[in-house]
Amino acid sequence: MIPPEIRRSVLLQKAIKLALAGTLLTFASFSATAADPSSDTETPQPPDILLGPLFNDVQNAKLLPDQKTFADAIPNSDPLMILADYRMQRNQSGFDLRHFVDVNFTLPKAGEKYVPPAGQSLREHIDGLWPVLTRSTKNVKKWDSLLPLPESYVVPGGRFREIYYWDSYFTMLGLAESGHWDKVADMVANFGYEIDAWGHIPNGNRTYYLSRSQPPFFAFMVELLAQHEGDDALKEYLPQLQKEYAYWMEGVETLQPGQQNQRVVKLEDGSVLNRYWDDRDTPRPESWVEDIATAKSNPNRPATEIYRDLRSAAASGWDFSSRWMDNPQQLSTIRTTTIVPVDLNALLYQLEKTLARASAAAGDRAKASQYDALANARQKAIEMHLWNNKEGWYADYDLQNNKIRDQLTAAALFPLYVNAAAKDRAAKVAAAAQAHQLQPGGLATTSVKSGQQWDAPNGWAPLQWVAAEGLQNYGQDDVAMEVTWRFLTNVQHTYDREKKLVEKYDVSSTGTGGGGGEYPLQDGFGWTNGVTLKMLDLICPQEKPCDSVPSTRPASLSATPTKTPSAATQ
């Protein structure tokens, strides 16, 4: 067996070109990009491209329990050299792939398990977690898949060692409740930096996330910061808000009715809406083996089509859900790119309204009017195409079958959350949510039991917050209180037993973490922490805040959202 300390001879150096024949590898100077996002550097490549057959072989060998581990591994030397070594060694007698990985890569270490002090209340526990979940990329190594950011940031926790786009807004809500406005400002600055550097906010700050984004919450983040800094925040981030919008709307000017391009859809009547899209159509590096197996299970579809739809579902944040599938029991029937999601379009309505407000703050009334017109057009398209009149709730539009889908999901609350719903329709959505989705432990994501994590019986903190705030926007305070109280009780009961907050909860009862999906239940957990703090302040009066969930349900919510209603709610 070749010893670990391989002497790269002149022969090896000459062999590199031959060993790498046909492999296209592109590198970027992370340090230069971090210092200047406008610097002319190439986009860094993900590990499946950098390492080619080595990456494929390691993942397929299942050397590590979690496929994300090797995607996050740091090469100890130039990947070109490592790959050349691998091509020369792999067919030799006694070659040990695991030993080769251990010698040539630094694997991510498991974080130290946080043991909270005994007797902490729920609020004290969350406040104590913020520094534990804070990370910095000041010491990012060359060839790391981690993308550097200028400021520190708060990660979700567990296997999620990097920042995530839509998670972060709900985390930031909690940071603001804890008085950490400096951290809120840092995280907004990081996302603004990413928009300048990459043209969009990636799924997370990893090279393998650059080909997609996530639910566009940047406008909400800037609006949150503006609560503390005033209109200065809106004016400061107006250029990045405009770039974010340009990313989502790229190609719209060339579309004819009935056509789609990347993230933009033009329906037959000329209405413009959006969908989720990933620029790549290969297995996800962080779920390599699982994606290959999913594609193989449905030989009637091109594998690249399935890969794109899996990736696009990851862009939606709902990875995975019956919402995207023809057969909820068969993941390979996923077709995310043929579905126009109601929540995405509600969020883009909010982005357009925020752009109008920011433009007005900057003194550009003409631009403000243009963005208001775009928001109004989208609102009409949502009411026309994303409302299921037969069922009485907002739903997704099916491009493949040219009709509204019937499935009720927690996404139906998003038009209420952004004040884009008509009053009578908001009342119908509230009734549907109460009748079909409200469970003992909170709001169910869907009513379908598929084994996927964004289905029954799971409930997720961000969707509870969207529902509670959206319902309050339309005076549906009783249903909002039920969602808030039941979810908080679930969080409190789980914390009482396990002394932790988790990524998702089983809402069919109280006191149980959720299941399903591609990985074990994670704790920490950024967005649960943030929503829990916000909800604690909803159920307890400001003059007498509570540190844990009270033993008896309050008669009413103590606070209401501060958003300015749109014309639809007036």
Curated annotation (Swiss-Prot):
UniProt subcellular location: Periplasm
Annotated GO biological process: cellular hyperosmotic response; trehalose catabolic process
Reactions catalysed: alpha,alpha-trehalose + H2O = alpha-D-glucose + beta-D-glucose
Enzyme Commission designation: 3.2.1.28
Organism superkingdom: Bacteria
Pfam families registered for this protein in UniProt: Trehalase
UniProt feature, compositional bias: Low complexity: 554-570
InterPro entries: 6-hairpin_glycosidase_sf, 6hp_glycosidase-like_sf, Glyco_hydro_37, Glyco_hydro_37_CS, Trehalase_periplasmic
SUPFAM superfamilies in alphabetical order: Six-hairpin glycosidases
Active-site residues (renumbered): D319 (proton donor/acceptor), E503 (proton donor/acceptor)
GO terms of molecular function: alpha,alpha-trehalase activity
Binding site for substrate: R159, W166, D167, N203, R212, S213, Q214, R284, P285, E286, G317, E518
Annotated stretches, region: Disordered: 544-570
UniProt KW keywords: Glycosidase, Hydrolase, Periplasm, Signal
Any one annotated GO CC term: periplasmic space
Signal sequence interval, chain numbering: 1-34
Function: Provides the cells with the ability to utilize trehalose at high osmolarity by splitting it into glucose molecules that can subsequently be taken up by the phosphotransferase-mediated uptake system.
Record family assignment: Belongs to the glycosyl hydrolase 37 family.
Assembly, per entry: Monomer.
Protein name: Periplasmic trehalase
Taxonomic source organism: Salmonella choleraesuis (strain SC-B67)
